[in-house]
Amino acid sequence: MMTTLRKLPLAVAVAAGMMSVQAMAVDFHGYARSGIGWTGSGGEQQCFQTTGAQSKYRLGNECETYAELKLGQEVWKEGDKSFYFDTNVAYSVAQQNDWEATSPAFREANVQGKNLIDALPGATIWAGKRFYQRHDVHMIDFYYWDISGPGAGLENIDLGFGKLSLAATRSSEAGGSSSFASDNIYDYVNETANDVFDVRLAQMEINPGGTLELGVDYGRANLRDDYRLVDGASKDGWMFTAEHTQSMLKGFNKFVVQYATDAMTSQGKGLNQGSGVAFDNEHFAYNINNNGHLLRILDHGAISLGDNWDMMYVGMYQDINWDNDNGTKWWTVGIRPMYKWTPIMSTLLEVGYDNVESQRTGDKNNQYKITLAQQWQAGDSIWSRPAIRVFATYAKWDEKWGYDYNDNSKTNPNYGKAVPANFEGGSFGRGDSDEWTFGAQMEIWW
């Protein structure tokens, strides 16, 4: 009897400890990719992206190890009210050695409070650094609506016919919209705070299986006292987005139209940029002035074509028209069909084509890329991960123009100017050539 009594406190302590561990359970999410590759002409794997394009077809065409590690926890809950703490640390290295040191990027640290306002059931208050309602095309790793950064907002306000979200974020800019003192002493600063104010109305059901999302973003350079922008700087801009999502063929199709002005045209995703740093009050990076407009028409999706076939696809036209004639027109189209031999083994073929025309020279850069991959994945969907794949990639390109990146922006007043491929000073264009690579890669998200 005494032995039993002596064991009781220990049992209670162990049970309490187990309950504490359960109560403090941490959510672990993330993403990672890594591998090894070779180039047909020798050396490590090369990756291929058209000069002037903002992304590339990624299957068998990623040359880095990249990871995002997310830790989060619901730290308080009472009824339907709760607080959630979320973090995200990202790493990227060149995958060339065993020991590759890198400084982590602290990409997310935020708290989200749900159902805290009785008058707005279902709404969430949040503050901190956050990936905020990002919209992307997975197969080209292209984010076309992404205002992520430090910020605050109120999201998912139920209006009956849709959900309203309001947010403000910041993206400080090195160079870009840099400023200097208004007196005769030019005190160049490294960063200028760029503010973005975002309004979205989503989940509006407008047809069977179809929803509409509308958004408007305003971005501005927020100057310090007694400072002014460099002459010719793009001070602010707007971006308007309409996206229709249709459920179809066990997947989805998204059709997107976006229009942006001035400071919102450089990145074209909802974050603004201004002008480059002035040097000696006369030398500028040539691409500082982004006054003008952007028009983007995009269609992409992922569908099932039967028991054994899935497919991703994208088609996009983007026109950046700048007052300084340094804009581009970018066409891209690609498909990634997947044939499933078994629920965990598949073959993928990715074919992508890019064409980028220089507004200044009228010349075009084009590239097509073909990748064949054999893959083993955790499930029978094109989205199933983790995946291990072996691949072979062939790319062929013909580039007629590039950018003048000779010397540096302090000494070259035309730094960043679009120039023909035969520009005497040289340019960042790749000429007419082709190459093939092969290797193996893992990819996972959880």
From Swiss-Prot:
Localization per Swiss-Prot or TrEMBL: Cell outer membrane
Gene3D superfamilies given in the database record: Porin, LamB type
GO molecular function, one term: maltodextrin transmembrane transporter activity
Signal peptide range: 1-25
Important in sugar transport, annotated site positions: 143
Protein's UniProt keywords contain DNA-binding: no
InterPro entries hit by this protein: G_neg_Bact_CarbUptk_Porin, Maltoporin, Porin_LamB, Porin_LamB_sf
GO biological process, one term: monoatomic ion transport
Keyword Protein transport among record annotations: no
Membrane topology: Multi-pass membrane protein
Stretches of the chain forming a coiled coil according to its record: none
Swiss-Prot/TrEMBL site (Greasy slide, important in sugar transport) positions: 31, 66, 99, 252, 383, 445
Catalytic reactions of this protein: beta-maltose(in) = beta-maltose(out)
Induction conditions: By maltose.
UniProt cross-references to Pfam families, sorted A to Z: LamB
Homology family: Belongs to the porin LamB (TC 1.B.3) family.
Assembly and interaction partners: Homotrimer formed of three 18-stranded antiparallel beta-barrels, containing three independent channels.
Reported function: Involved in the transport of maltose and maltodextrins.
PANTHER family in UniProt: CRYPTIC OUTER MEMBRANE PORIN BGLH-RELATED
NCBIfam families, sorted: PRK09360.1
Protein name: Maltoporin
Organism of provenance: Escherichia fergusonii (strain ATCC 35469 / DSM 13698 / CCUG 18766 / IAM 14443 / JCM 21226 / LMG 7866 / NBRC 102419 / NCTC 12128 / CDC 0568-73)
